[in-house]
């Protein structure tokens, strides 16, 4: 099938024609369309010149959400803590560790994985505005778009099944407001 990554020679030609960004935008929109479903919300966009797409899964019973997000060679698992939940939960990194320990979120099962490999530059948690905590694996070079989409759909099913556990982790860790 068609490769998820463009060959470097193609990228150079596209850059020379100033078309790389346009083609990447179409590529990501195409991937988003193939993954779109009435069961969950998808999105795509651009940040700092790089295109990305993702799947948004609300964590029922909380005001926070979880995303699978793909940007370049990064396959991300991301918890988006709402300001409200952030205030109640305190140490978000500890919450992320508990989530990783007790659920499939943040777990990429890299053994015998034909799609993902460990990221060499992994930082434990990346945060934006200290609210979005993500961890990522790297998408392997030879992966086809079709195989990546199948992998994402399977991952979404596993994650959706574990979101109730995440809600329970939130509830167990909300700081008591009573003195």
Kindly label every feature range from the protein language model:
Residues 2-142:
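Polyanion-binding interface signature
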Residues 12, 16, 20-21, 136-179:
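Long, solvent-exposed, polar/charged low-complexity segments
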């Amino acid at each position: 099938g068609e490769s998820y990554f463009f060959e470097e020679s193609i990228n150079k030609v596209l850059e020379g024609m100033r078309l790389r960004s346009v083609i990447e935008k179409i590529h990501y929109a195409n991937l988003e369309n193939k993954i779109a479903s009435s069961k969950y919300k998808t999105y795509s966009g651009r940040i700092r010149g790089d295109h990305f797409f993702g799947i948004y899964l609300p964590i029922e019973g909380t005001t926070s959400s979880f995303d699978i997000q793909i940007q370049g060679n990064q396959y991300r698992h991301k918890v988006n803590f709402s300001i409200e939940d952030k205030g109640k939960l305190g140490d978000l990194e500890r919450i992320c560790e508990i989530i990783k320990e007790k659920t499939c979120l943040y777990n990429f099962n890299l053994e015998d994985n034909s799609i993902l490999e460990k990221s060499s530059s992994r930082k434990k948690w990346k945060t934006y505005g200290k609210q979005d905590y993500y961890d990522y694996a790297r998408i392997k070079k030879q992966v086809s778009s079709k195989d990546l989409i199948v992998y994402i759909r399977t991952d979404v099913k596993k994650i959706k099944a574990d979101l109730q556990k995440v809600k329970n982790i939130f509830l167990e860790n909300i700081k008591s407001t009573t003195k």
